[in-house]
Amino acid sequence: MEREYFKELSRRLREEGTETSLANKQKLEVLLHGQPVLYVSTTSDVFLLPAGSKSEEASELYHRVAAVADEVYEYVKVLQGAPLLHVSRLNEDFRLLADFGGAVLAGRERENSRGYQFVTWIWNYNRQGISHGHYYEGNYQAAKQDFAVRSGLISRAQLFSPEQLAELYRATDFLLEEGPEPDEKLPNDQPDGNQAETLREDDSIHPA
């Protein structure tokens, strides 16, 4: 997993204008003005190097990198252990991350180091197919939020409060890690089309 993690983390940081360098298999260095000031471990821990210890700019960079490092580690790890989603007419190898309340959360690594894609679907009647895909390019948190709403783990009306967002992530993370339903199931609702980063209506996709 270390190789995939560092590759994706480097890509994400590069998109934000942050340069990285792979020091060795256990350490990804983060550069500021061409000089290493931080490094990230294979378990997403971020350490400040002596060159950045007295720099306010390096300190700000530390906090930005730490947030990205944690998010990338979370989705790379969960995809590594997830089973394939076996559905016919599905051209890409998506991995099944969660299946609850008639909704599916899946993800895949895109080809040619183009990052990760996440999608939520709705099972058709009798679970004979999936449709109405909401696609998210690299935005795992938004995909989890959409899944939580579509599956009924949390209501759409709760999406704008920080406390309610924390509950959304708690409920979804519980399902991803433990499998069974949390003790308290929240009311069902459906999101409108504007919530998806990329939204398109799929033809129905049927299980293999």
Segments from the language model and where they lie:
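Short secondary-structure junctions
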Residues: 13-26, 84-86, 94
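Short, structured interface segments
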Residues: 65-79, 139-155
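Short aromatic-glycine-(Arg/Gly/Cys) micro-motifs in beta-strand/loop hairpins
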Residues: 107-134, 168
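A short, exposed loop/beta-hairpin motif centered on an aromatic-Gly-Thr core
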Residues: 127-141, 155-157
